[in-house]
Amino acid sequence: MEWLERLKKSGNGDLEVTYKPFVLEQANFASRHEPGWKIWEDKLFPSRDVPPLLAAQCAANQGEEAFLKYNQLLFRARHQKELDITNQLILLDVAREAGLDLERFSEDIRTRAGVEEVAVRHEEAVAKHGIFGVPTLFFNGGAPVFVKLEEGDWEKSPEADQDLLRELRSVSEKQPFILEIKQPESAKLAERSAKKYKPYME
């Protein structure tokens, strides 16, 4: 998430961010398939999640710094440039921009070298923590907090970044009894999301 990266760069010395993969489509669509269905094993399912998650894990195979750079550029490719990050050519372009070893990256993509790690992390998130969506944040062993953020002018304010971090950390560490907070606008976001995935749910 961009705001976490901004916080790290702004001098939050105690902030360490560890990213772990979670396959949202597995959480959303597993109940519509046969028991034991795993999206990362179903090569015929038109997944929007698996290709970029596997690519990010292939970047991680080249070290943490490579992963962090690739992950940030991948996020920007999707949310700022609105590129199709299921396309292997786009994923390769991002790897090139991140300065990765392209030969190794391409081979890892071809052999799906990161699929086992993605599967293990996803199933661990569900089994241990009941994760259902992304992004979900943990702070110092506190309760998991699922967050939806709207892009806007607030992202230009370092104070807003700090305020958001403080509030989410408080909910995670000190207020685990808060189970859900919603604004009316979130219903519209849910409706748009449902329309996006409707073709896969029929």
Placement of each model-derived feature along the sequence:
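Structural alpha/beta surface segment adjacent to cysteine/selenocysteine redox centers
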Residues: 1-90, 167-171, 175, 179-182, ...
